[in-house]
Design a protein with these regions (language model features):
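Short amphipathic alpha-helical segment within the helicase RecA-like ATPase core
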Residues: 1-175
């Protein structure tokens, strides 16, 4: 039994990008017709993996290298629908945003700046709540405040909510 899953296709795209990124060629061709029909949206997942692998945090590099790689998809099967292309784009933008936050040095992305950046996500439809030290004291969040006492910067807790899922979907929460 074939147990090929969407994440396998994403990983395949990432592996492909890793191999071609340092090659001499800058143009590649991929046939969607060679992918067996049971792997719906194969090309979408494959290109998504390539895009995720292409991420680089080079915000502070003085010499930024730019390399254009052209991927030409031809054929009529397994192409991503416009709706799926939007889904992949949103996933990529969210992933890159998180990677940017994680990669920022602590002297740049301090608690104040972190809260400010996450507050800007309200424009994307997220409900963002920012709890400063005064609110945290009121909530009895003494352990969090205790950790923050070692810093000259204030402590913050930020919660974000996305209510765009179907009504019957189970809630999903991340804590970190």
């Amino acid at each position: 039994k074939n147990s090929f899953k969407s994440f396998d296709i994403v990983n395949l795209g990432a592996e492909f990008y890793g191999r071609i990124n340092y090659g001499k060629n800058s143009e590649y061709f991929v046939s969607s017709d060679t992918m067996i029909g049971k792997y719906e949206n194969f090309i979408g997942y494959f290109l998504h993996g390539m895009k995720l692998k292409s991420y680089e945090f080079n915000k502070y590099k003085t010499k930024k290298e730019t390399r254009i790689i052209s991927i030409n998809v031809f054929g009529n099967k397994n192409k991503p629908s416009f709706q799926n292309q939007l889904k992949f784009k949103a996933l990529e933008e969210g992933t890159f945003y998180a990677r940017d936050l994680v990669s920022e040095p602590g002297n740049i992305l301090n608690p104040d700046e972190y809260a400010k950046r996450l507050k800007s996500l309200k424009k994307d439809g997220l409900k963002v709540n920012i709890y400063d030290e005064k609110k945290l004291k009121k909530m009895g969040m003494n352990a969090l405040l205790g950790v923050g006492m070692g810093s000259v910067r204030g402590s913050y807790l930020v919660t974000m909510e996305w209510n765009g899922a179907k009504n019957n979907s189970k809630p999903l929460a991340f804590v970190g």
